[in-house]
């Protein structure tokens, strides 16, 4: 399994999409409420709940040195694949990056056109844009794939918002538990899924086709749809 331990593999599988947590963004959530008169709460559309609850618009810097906002510049109106990594990682990150490079090739010219890849560092203090640029070049990253760094507090907010967190503090403190999963989001349709990056690249691409392209998907996988 590319040198990845069973524990790491199971940890990756454990970071599943937060289907159950979707209920948190119902009328009982302050972020999901508005006023309809007489104190009655109004449930926001799924897309708005996803933006407010998960896709935090924090400032980031790409490996090319460009300053961006996560939601406004990278996610809004797009189909995106997001994972976490760090440049000195020698475990799960190695096969994850390799498999995503192969998946990018299998997707042909779609990456950078209608699908976008984002890899966010878990160690922003060390992973400067220059460090991430060297990492991207070393691994043969193609167009349409950005490596991102930023302030530690903003990275942490994204990590938790995107569902790469554990309720167990000990497990959550283990960086390896947040690697090996790719969050798949179709922002306009409020679709929210994932794939396992340690799976074969062809499986990753099939998962992306399912999440990104299925014409009937909205009825069964839309984020927080009641």
What are these regions (language model features)?
Residues 1-17:
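N-terminal secretory signal peptides and thylakoid transit peptides that target proteins
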Residues 37-72, 98-99:
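N-terminal "domain-start" segment that seeds a small globular fold
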Residues 55-56, 80, 180:
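Short loop/turn microsegments at loop-to-beta-strand junctions
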Residues 70-94, 100:
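Short active-site neighborhood of thiol/selenol oxidoreductases, capturing the structured segment around
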Residues 97-118:
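Conserved helix-turn-beta segment immediately C-terminal to the redox Cys motif
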Residues 114-127, 144-153:
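Thiol-based oxidoreductase modules, predominantly thioredoxin-like and allied folds used
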Residues 134-179:
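Short, internal strand/loop/helix patches
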Residues 172-226:
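Thiol-/selenol-based redox modules, centered on thioredoxin-like
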């Amino acid at each position: 399994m590319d040198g990845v331990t069973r524990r790491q593999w199971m940890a990756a599988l454990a970071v599943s999409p937060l289907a159950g947590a979707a209920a948190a963004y119902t009328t009982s959530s302050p972020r999901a409420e508005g006023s309809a008169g007489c104190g009655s709460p109004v449930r926001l559309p799924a897309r708005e709940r996803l933006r407010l609850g998960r896709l935090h618009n924090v400032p980031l810097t790409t490996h090319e040195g460009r300053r961006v906002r996560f939601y406004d510049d990278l996610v809004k109106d797009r189909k995106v694949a997001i994972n976490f990594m760090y440049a000195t990682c020698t475990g799960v990150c190695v096969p994850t990056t390799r498999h995503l490079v192969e998946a990018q090739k299998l997707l042909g010219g779609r990456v950078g056109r209608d699908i976008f890849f984002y890899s966010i560092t878990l160690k922003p203090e060390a992973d400067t844009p220059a460090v991430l640029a060297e990492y991207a070049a070393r691994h043969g990253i193609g167009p349409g794939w950005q490596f991102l760094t930023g302030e530690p507090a903003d990275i942490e907010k994204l990590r938790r918002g995107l569902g790469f967190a554990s309720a167990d503090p000990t497990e959550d403190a283990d960086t390896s538990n947040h690697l090996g999963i790719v969050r798949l989001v179709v922002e306009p349709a409020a679709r929210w899924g994932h794939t396992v990056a340690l799976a074969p690249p062809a499986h990753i691409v099939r998962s992306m086709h399912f999440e990104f392209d299925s014409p009937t998907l909205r009825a069964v996988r839309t984020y927080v749809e009641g």
